[in-house]
């Protein structure tokens, strides 16, 4: 089976870091500072959302993640995205995931709130196992994975122009 890891970003609050630790899966953290990270294996990206809420989607994807994904080698290894957010921010809940999914043409696999629940951990572990099993069959089977949007506050994303 092909190698698969988790690549994630977590600010100094460490919310995403704590979630990733609960997964017990091989992981690499995108640095908070400007140090570059380059990956040479397939990965699932776990990313928090930094939008202000309402219709303000500006800044939803952390700058460090944008810098990481601006590297073509890093982009080509991404097999899917999982995002976190805060439902208090309404329409921008976990918005970084759909943005990255659309730009990279990879599946949005799951969204969770804040630190995630035990159910979120189990779902992400199952997604990881399923994707790892299917990675050798290339992108064709990755696209067949079911996208999960589990939070009742999640609404379809509106098109915003920048």
Curated annotation (Swiss-Prot):
Top-level lineage group:
Bacteria
Check the record and name the Pfam families matching this protein: Flavodoxin_NdrI
Q: Return one Gene Ontology term, BP aspect.
A: protein modification process
Which Gene Ontology MF annotations are present?
FMN binding
- Entries under InterPro entries matching the protein: Flavoprotein-like_sf, RNR_Ib_NrdI_bac, RNR_NrdI
- Give the family this protein belongs to, as stated in its UniProt record: Belongs to the NrdI family.
Function comment: Probably involved in ribonucleotide reductase function.
Record-given protein name: Protein NrdI
Recorded name of the encoding gene: nrdI
């Amino acid at each position: 089976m092909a190698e698969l890891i988790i690549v994630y970003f977590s600010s100094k609050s460490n919310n995403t870091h704590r979630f990733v630790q609960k997964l017990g899966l091989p992981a690499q953290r995108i640095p908070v500072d400007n140090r570059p990270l380059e990956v040479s294996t397939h990965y699932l990206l776990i990313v928090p959302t930094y939008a202000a809420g309402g219709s303000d989607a500006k800044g939803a994807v952390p700058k460090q993640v944008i810098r990481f994904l601006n590297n073509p080698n890093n982009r080509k290894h991404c097999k899917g995205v999982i995002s976190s957010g805060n439902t208090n921010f309404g329409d921008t809940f976990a918005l970084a995931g759909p943005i990255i999914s659309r730009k990279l043409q990879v599946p949005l696999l799951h969204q969770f709130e804040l630190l995630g629940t035990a159910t979120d951990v189990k779902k992400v572990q199952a997604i990881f196992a399923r994707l790892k099993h299917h990675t050798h069959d290339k992108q064709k089977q990755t696209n067949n994975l079911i996208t999960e949007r589990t939070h009742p506050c999640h609404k379809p994303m509106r098109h915003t122009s920048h």
